Amino acid sequence: MAAGVIRPLCDFQLPLLRHHPFLPSDPEPPETSEEEEEEEEEEEEEEGEGEGLGGCGRILPSSGRAEATEEAAPEGPGSPETPLQLLRFSELISDDIRRYFGRKDKGQDPDACDVYADSRPPRSTARELYYADLVRLARGGSLEDEDTPEPRVPQGQVCRPGLSGDRAQPLGPLAELFDYGLQQYWGSRAAAGWSLTLERKYGHITPMAQRKLPPSFWKEPTPSPLGLLHPGTPDFSDLLASWSTEACPELPGRGTPALEGARPAEA
């Protein structure tokens, strides 16, 4: 009987009771008397008056409090003191560099060695020489003064005057060809004897601009399908024949001897 009457509570499906916390979530402020509220209001008014006096001190620079607040204020990147500090720092760095790496006298440092003692200052800079040449050419003159004498050099080593006009620059045996090809631009500076010497030596040579070159001179070697150049030797027999038929004594042989020497090479 008792076992059939007694059943667990979960079978009755009773509503669960909610347990409230002991402490409220929003505690109410403690009740204060009117005297305490008046004291708090007076303290707040005094603090506001103190802040107002501090602001006036910042506005009036004559007061001591204003100076104290200005000194206590942090200096930002936009303050006027920042450039002055950077300038002082750069001056200190430059002084240190001059002290350790600059020129020193024997009195300051007995072991000092002047590395600039053997150097010679240049007479004129490259820019000055460049502009001087441009001005001289614009006025219709030559790159050299007319009174400049021809340089005396040993035989076989011809010197051509430089653009700056300060000294002659040796160019080797090819300088004669340059002098012969550019003598028309020298003007009255070229000596008559020197021009005649060049004319006798190189006047019989036909310039490349006046020669009739064969097609092989303008034909480039064609690459093979693999991207490599043809291993065979290019055929310049027509070029050699055209040069040998001309009356050019600079070649060792003329006409038939040159062709005969070229045919065995082809074979």
UniProtKB/Swiss-Prot annotation:
Biased composition, class Low complexity, residue ranges = 74-83
Q: Can you tell which superkingdom this protein's organism belongs to?
A: Eukaryota
Question: A GO BP term, please?
Answer: digestive tract morphogenesis
Where are the annotated segments for Disordered? 19-88, 142-163, 247-267
- Record's compositionally biased regions (Acidic residues): 28-50
Q: Which Pfam families does this UniProt record tie to the protein? A: TEADIR3
Looking up InterPro entries in the UniProt record yields: TEADIR3_omega_loop
Q: List the keywords (alphabetical).
A: Developmental protein
Q: Does the UniProt entry include the keyword ATP-binding?
A: no
What is the protein's known function? Plays a critical role in intestinal function. Acts by promoting the development of enteroendocrine cells (EECs) of the gastrointestinal tract and pancreas. It is thereby required for normal enteroendocrine peptide hormone secretion.
Clinical note on disease: Diarrhea 11, malabsorptive, congenital: A disease characterized by severe, life-threatening watery diarrhea associated with generalized malabsorption and a paucity of enteroendocrine cells. DIAR11 is characterized by onset of intractable diarrhea within the first few weeks of life.
**Official protein name in the record:** Protein PERCC1
Q: Which gene encodes it?
A: PERCC1
